[in-house]
Structure formats: structure tokens, C-alpha cells
Amino acid sequence: MVRNSEITLEQIFKEGRINLENDDYNCVICSFPLFDGLQCKRGHGACKSCWEKIIGENGKKECHSCRISIKSLDDLSKNLYLEKEIFKQKVACLNNGREKFGNTLVIKSDGGCKRQDIPIEKLLHHIKNECGYLLIDCKYSRDCKYYKQISLEQHQNECQFMSIHCPALCGKKDSRMNINKHLETPNSCKPLISINNSNNSNGNGNGIDDESIIKLSNSIVEIQKSYQNQIKKIKENSESEIAALKDSLYYSKSRIKNLEDEVEELKDRFSTLESMINKLDDSATSRSGTILINGWKMKLKSLDVGHSIVEEQFYIGTNRFYIRIYPFGDSYDNQGYVTVKLGRIDGEEYHLDIGLKVSIKGFDNKKKVLLSYYPGDIAHNIDQLVETWETSKEFKMILHFKVDLKPKIK
């Protein structure tokens, strides 16, 4: 734990009390954080203490990395961005009740501050004003053990070196240690009470002798001691309960933070799933594609009216469709046309929006292309003229199609 309220952030860094996992924030020479880092003209950094050794009487007076000449600290500059980033880093309170021995982290039994997320720039303010676990040197004696800041009142009630007045009202003022001895020594404490012996040689005018007064004083002292012990126990119990409440609050805050992170993660997952569902919805009501046919000449030798050159099957949701291309027409009624037929194999009844675009290259003569939907919802000719394939030229056909399903109104 930190001792002495006059401690500075520079001391904390130089003593190695702060460890930063990112090596970019640590001095490349001493490995301590770059609290007061400086850099050469080429951007190579180190902490001020290491630079002072470099330019010292026995130093090399050159950059440890690029060997550029460094004669004084005036040849160096600060990296303000890096300094700002370092001070943003969050660390645990130094009064966390943990100490490191070698590579072993030991959790001390007296506990400590639970804060784990303090920005370095606010660390000193937290230690001095918020934490309560700062170790304070007793101002009454160097021989007295230091105490935690939150235990100031308890320490003042128990410190053996603190000056107090005798509770028996004798007027004596001394350290608590000496006052206790004073009270335990017979006949050493004489209360400041006027005793009148005019009517009674062994007592005062009211018939109360000196011995009774001393007994009364001692009784008062015992009552005060008992009261102080009760107060001490109440404070100890209260401190224990407060510490437990602080622990519970800390872990509750930590749990809330974890839950908030989980909520954000669930939001991201929901957004992803929503996007996937939208895509599935699109695929369930629409389908588009392209059919490319090369080298018809060889394919057409064995074909006649009613024979298709290609068939493509596809799904829109749970509905299965096909597209067939008949180079000589799908029937003798359509002989002389290239028939492109869209048909539904199975699925529910829908109205269809059909988009077909045909591009045929390599013909000499003209003939029309018939686009039809089976079993007869759509059948029409298009104005596009295509060339016949009775020549020796090779040609290709590109068919772009798009089908949208719409619920059928009954």
C-alpha cells in the first residue's frame, strides 16, 4: 500500500508501482512506463532518467537506437500523443492490498481498495481523496505504527503517544500511555475537587472523604474505558460491514458492466440475424440468374420441334421452377420461334412477375423469340429479332431472367 500522502506520480512511476502491458508505453532501456518520456529528432524515445544517464559525464551522448548526437536534454522533445495515451491507461489502485514478491502475487489478509479501472491521470486524486487506504504516519510519534486514512478516528482514540487530559479531572495532561500509568499508580491522581475538613476531620463538609472521591474518579475512568471499548467494537464491526458492502458494490458494478457488454453483443447478433432473415425473405420471394449457351450448332443436329436444348431448375422459397429453351419451338403451333418456357413444378399458387432478356449473337436470318409461362399465366412474343442458326456460323445465347412471387388473391 502507499504510505505518505505527499507521494507524487513521478515517485510511483520510478518505484515501478505501475505496470503497463503494452511495451510501446514502456522505456526501451529500463522497462518502466514512459511517465516523463523524451525522444530524439528521429522519434526514438526513452524516459528522462535514462536520457540523463546517456548524456551524463560517463554517457555516450548519442541516441541508443539511431546513434544521433545528444548533447543535452534540449536536443530532445516530448511525444505529447504518447504521453496522453499513457495517462489514459487504466490501472488498479495501488492500495489494493496486494504485494508482489518475485513473480508471485500475494493477496494480503487486511484487504484494500477494490478499484481496478482508474485512469493514471486520476490515480493520485483517488489515492489521496477517495481511497481511504492510504497509509498515514502518526504525527504524535515516529515510534507509533502508521494507520490507514479511513482509520483516523480509531487511531486517535487508541494512539498511546497522543496527548490527553486525565479523565479523573486532576488536571494532568500527558501521552495516553503515561496517563494510563498515572491512573494505575496509587495516590498519584489527585482530583481537582475542593475538600472541606471543618466539620469532619476525615472528609469534606458533606461527609465525603478523599478515599470515596478517588474511588468515584476511578469508577469514572473504568466507565470511560468500557465506553471506549464498546465504541471500538462498534467501529470494527461497522468497518467490516462497510468493507463487505464495498466489495458487494464493486462486484455488482462489475456484473452490470459484463451484462451491458452481453447486451451489446446480443444487439450485434440480432442485427446480423435480422440481416440474414431479410436476405432469406428476399430469396423466398425472388430469384434471378443467367443462362449462357455456347456452340448451338453441334447441339441442334439431333433436335426437332418440341425438344429443349437446356433445362435449369431452381427454387424460390419452397416453390420449384424450371426454365427450358426450345430452339425449334415447344410445339408445332410455335414452330419458327425460339421458345423460352418458365414452368412451376410444385409449390403454392402465386402470381408471377417475370422479366426475361435475351441476347443471341451469330445469326444471318431473322426470327422471333417466344417467351411463355406454363401452365399459361403468361405467354407473349417479344419484339426482339434474332438470327436463324441454319448457317455454318457458331453463335451463343445469353438469357437473363428474374422471377418475383406475389401471393395469389383468392
From Swiss-Prot:
One of its GO terms (molecular function) is zinc ion binding. A zinc finger (RING-type) spans 27-67. One of its GO terms (cellular component) is cytoplasm. Its main location: cytoplasm. The keyword Coiled coil applies. It is found in: Cytoplasm. InterPro entries: Cep57_MT-bd_dom, TRAF-like, Znf_RING/FYVE/PHD. Residues 216-284 form a coiled coil. Keywords: Coiled coil, Cytoplasm, Metal-binding, Repeat, Zinc, Zinc-finger. The keyword Zinc applies. A zinc finger (TRAF-type) spans 81-154, 154-213. Belongs to the TNF receptor-associated factor family. The MATH/TRAF domain binds to receptor cytoplasmic domains. Probable adapter protein and signal transducer that links members of the tumor necrosis factor receptor family to different signaling pathways by association with the receptor cytoplasmic domain and kinases. This is TNF receptor-associated factor family protein DDB_G0279745. It comes from Dictyostelium discoideum.
